[in-house]
UniProtKB/Swiss-Prot annotation:
The keyword Signal does not apply. Binds 2 nickel ions per subunit. This is Urease subunit alpha. The gene is ureC. Keywords: Cytoplasm, Hydrolase, Metal-binding, Nickel. It catalyses: urea + 2 H2O + H(+) = hydrogencarbonate + 2 NH4(+).
Amino acid sequence: MKLTRAQHASLYGPTVGDKVRLADTDLLLEIEKDYTVYGDECKFGGGKVLRDGMGQSAVYTRDEGVLDLIITNATIIDYTGIVKADIGIKDGHIVGIGKGGNPDIMDGVESHMIVGASTEAIAGEGLIVTAGGIDAHIHFISPQQIDVAIASGITTMLGGGTGPATGTKATTCTPGKWNIERMLEAADAFPVNLGFLGKGNASTPAPLREQIEAGAIGLKLHEDWGTTPAAIRTCLSVADRMDVQVAIHTDTLNEAGFVEDTIKAIGDRVIHTYHTEGAGGGHAPDIMKVAGLPNVLPSSTNPTRPFTVNTIDEHLDMLMVCHHLDPNVPEDVAFADSRIRPETIAAEDILQDLGVISMISSDSQAMGRVGEVIIRTWQTADKMKKQRGALAEDQGKGNDNVRIKRYVSKYTINPAITHGIDDYVGSVEVGKLADLVLWDPRFFGVKPELILKGGLIAYSQMGDPNASIPTPQPVFSRPMFGSFGRARGTTSITFLSKAAMDLGVHEALGLQKKIAHVKNCRSISKRSMKYNDATPNIEIDPETYEVKVDGEMITCKPFEEVALAQRYFLF
């Protein structure tokens, strides 16, 4: 029996050479490799393959390699490749990406990918699977952010705060041992991976060390607490000794020094620069030049992604609120005006597309939207495809695979590497926590179908619970069983520093979630960033704000209409 490509795709999803459009964007993926076996595909349903003695083994037990969950015939988008495969999950982790089923009657089934009586199935045919997103710039202002974030496909949130305190509304810091311990206790209640940054603004080491020993996974330097060269040097020295990351929001007003002074204080040590363009804060007008340095891991926040006709006006109002400024004080208004520059925001689009800026995050409720990291990432990718055409690496191939890998890396693997958690999350790879997001291609980047947390469904598009089937309206993202009870603790991780784990902080606090410590935070560089490791020379004119990359001026026009927008949000 032979199937046409169209018939095969409708039954089992696309295969090598098939192309899929991502929602209403101009981005096309092409399957690079198919790990399934033609004619022996797994498929669940009445009269289908995954039945006893057929695609499901009648004899193998869980201890003999039977999976807890198989996602069949999934299209995977990951920095590692764009492939078609079955995904095998056991004990909450990915154990196989390849061919699952019954090895007694099917070709190519791997010994760790056996489907048996212990196996649940998710039909991945025609769906796209990505790693759960990582938002590495969270102001923990309200716990309700977590519901919005996970519903959008974010499964790991890193940042700081203690709730709607004035300091947290402006800065991403959980300051001091007592506050860190309380936030670690609160983390048990949520079905996402969490990690907290301490306050890095101190010019002596002891106040910084005690926060890392209390459980902080890193330190945040913020201008509202005084990001002076002395504080920068001290913070990085402590981080180097204790193997944690430092995130920085530099001195917009250039009070304690200019961007050159900050670069000198950083030296050759690795650092994560938040909202590197500068609208979210940082040396005006030229903080973005740090994005070209080999030891700087730069990120954007999502309100400037992508550059549109509304970006500038929105930012001025946001800034006044977030940084506790008074519109009646001329100096406060001047502070706000100095940060919002159309020229550098336009250049930020290009730098994202060139792989110079390596990450995208939210800046949640503090000049950023927690549920829009993923959607704005893909809006930026689409805007750049429309304005700049295919990347050089994609020229002549008829697909956008390199661009797609570049952009998915910005909110998955790269923040994981930056903050020392890439052994656990950040990609669709064997051994990692099964934090996976399943998308209907028509809604890719906008509304996930399923969000798996540690191998269990935590959120899903779900219809009326009183209906006779799951699909009747109203259909929207709702919490599932992985979001409740003790399941949250076995399917999610609270990240600590190694110092805190060695001191037994998790045991002293009685934390219920899985615990893991960050590592290799200080041995990385820009070269560690997947598909986003470019280090060109960046210059910003101090009067016109024009941006040059390796001597060539870069800019783009703002869009009046973007993809993934109003047609998806009619209700």
